[in-house]
């Protein structure tokens, strides 16, 4: 994610240091675990709302983009942004927590971040986590969304992206699925990186410029 390139393409970049990111200590860094869809989402929205008041910001042409946890964030925000965003891009993000729990290759992360399996009805952290799975808010989606995923991503399988794309299409929302059969959680091959950048900016330019 090249913020300088985004700025060079005439975009103002807002990158909130929300909960879960380094810089404010371990407690801040771990604050997202067990609270997906909670305070960290308020961090995003409070940041964009504050910046939207500035005279150099066009609040009618805002977009949200993210990868990994940021991809999940975009899927979640898609159902909660209340008209703030006019275009979305989600790269390798979790969309359906229940299927994610059973298809990831690394169980430690889903147990730590989501609290455990979705069938544990006695665990309040589990119940909160799965209640905030982005797929449960598709009925509130309105903004055009581009979904990007690599077939060799075993941490967050490409089926998460496919589900999100299909959901958008079935809702009648403009959507695009950029699928890399030879990439994992990252886009590492030069030719794929060029394609990624090209489609990324084409999508944003189409809806925000």
Cite the ranges covered by each PLM segment:
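Active-site-proximal cap/loop segments of hydrolase catalytic domains
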Residues: 1-9, 13-209
């Amino acid at each position: 994610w090249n913020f300088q390139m985004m700025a060079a393409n005439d975009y103002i970049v807002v990158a909130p240091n929300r909960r879960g990111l380094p810089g404010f200590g371990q407690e801040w860094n771990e604050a997202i675990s067990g609270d997906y869809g909670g305070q960290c989402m308020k961090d995003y929205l409070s940041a964009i709302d504050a910046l939207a008041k500035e005279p150099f910001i066009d609040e009618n042409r805002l977009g949200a983009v993210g990868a990994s946890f940021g991809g999940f964030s975009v899927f979640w925000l898609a159902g909660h942004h209340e008209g703030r965003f006019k275009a979305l891009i989600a790269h390798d993000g979790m969309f359906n927590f229940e299927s994610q729990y059973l298809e990831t290759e690394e169980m430690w992360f889903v147990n730590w971040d989501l609290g455990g399996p979705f069938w544990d009805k006695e665990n309040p952290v589990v119940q909160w986590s799965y209640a905030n799975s982005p797929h449960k808010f598709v009925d509130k989606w309105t903004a055009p969304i581009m979904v990007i995923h690599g077939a060799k991503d075993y941490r967050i399988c490409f089926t998460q992206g496919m589900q999100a794309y299909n959901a958008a299409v079935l809702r009648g929302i403009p959507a695009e699925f950029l699928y890399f059969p030879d990439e994992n959680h990252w886009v590492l091959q030069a030719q794929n990186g060029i394609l990624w950048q090209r489609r990324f900016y084409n999508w944003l330019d189409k809806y925000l410029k």
